[in-house]
Amino acid sequence: MVKSFRMKALIAGAAVAAAVSAGAVSDVPAAKVLQPTAAYAAETVFSQNNGASGFLPGRYDVQAMAPAMFNWSRESRFAGNTDGTLKWQNDIRTTPQNGAGAVIDGDGTVYLHSRDGEMKAFNPDGSVKWVTGNLGKTYTQSPVLGTNGVIYLASYDKKIYFIDKETGEILTTVPLSGGPSSETVIGSDGTLYFSTLDNYVHAIKPTSKSTWTERWKLKTNGVVSSVPVLAKNGTVYVGTYNYVFYAINSGTGQVKWSRTTSNAFKGYPVIDKDGNIYAGNQDGQLYAYTSTGSLKWTFPLNGFSSSSPAIDHNGNIYIGSGSGELFSISKNGDMNWSFYTDGPVRTAPLIDAKGTVYFGSDDMKVYAADANGNELWSYQTDSNVVSSPQLAEDGTLYIGSYTKLMAFGK
């Protein structure tokens, strides 16, 4: 059954009509119809700002198809080619934080961290290229691919691993004061930013494939609940479980400003080309802040949000909700459409070059919706779909559930 913005539009329209006939002023948002667009001219190499975003370009492997899960717009330069046909699946247990999932290098190798404490590298046909074990169990984090052929992975055994991308060899480890509460992100000079469960945000700089130095660490008011992101102006943004959102100078570790809300920010924020920050909160709202910390607007998500948003080249923001909805919201805070599922949407959506939006739900389905929120296809899995999707150059979609890594394509 197609569950799209159409039902939302009918309900909203009926509510508005009833309010008008009664002489009342209605604040029910109307769903907008977005005109389908052809695939736009995307970057030929990976760009964190392959949309209308304002991230600080880091030393990621730009020849990779998708070197990071977070700290970018999540608008892919590739077009998906799948109608929901499953190419292959591989048993792998994941318990991701913040919608963590796989990354893809330039030759199509897919890297994923498992709940069993293994980093696995899969060939594009689903065969296993290599496995590196004993990396820490429990929650799984997304690896990131650096420019030097090194994979960086934050692990719950209180370490950051430097792993050779080609062989899986552990090159070195960075001991941590607490288990990581976020993925690692890479700055413009190669500095790694991450947070730990003892309330610190850290900045360390690799000096080779196997050496590093600490730049700074900042004690926050509580465990960091969101993945750090870096804006073009050099600001690191994070939220905590103690309901505070921080803007931090990435060079010094000094707090620039902070704002208190009624609950915790989860996932990671996105940043638009003007420096505005958009972050979902457990209080059920999407917050929009300016780069100086002024609140622009909030948007009600009808349920808690642990989903990370994505932003497209028109400035539209896409985010999931505990209500089971995926929302498309304009940069002005107006609803374009919402798409209904039968379970919380915790994954970060992915937008392809044609405007198709891919995401997963706790109703154990993978979904694809067009630019107007109409369902294109869905696929029933055997467990909650909790890791966020990625696209390869050939249009293959990779996404994980609690039990499997799945590849969809033709």
From Swiss-Prot:
Keywords attached to this entry: Secreted, Signal
SMART domains, per the entry: PQQ
Subcellular locations according to the entry: Secreted
Chief location of this protein within or outside the cell: secreted
Pfam families (alphabetical): PQQ_2 (PF13360)
Source organism, top-level taxon: Bacteria
Secretion signal, residue range per the UniProt entry: 1-41
Matching SUPFAM superfamilies: Quinoprotein alcohol dehydrogenase-like (SSF50998)
Phenotype seen when the gene is deleted: No PcrA-related phenotype.
Subunit relationships: Interacts with PcrA, Pdp, YclM, YkvL, YhcQ and YomL. The interaction with PcrA is not essential for cell viability or repair of UV-induced lesions.
Biological function: Increases the processivity of the PcrA helicase, but does not bind to DNA.
Official protein name in the record: Uncharacterized protein YxaL
Gene that this polypeptide is encoded by: yxaL
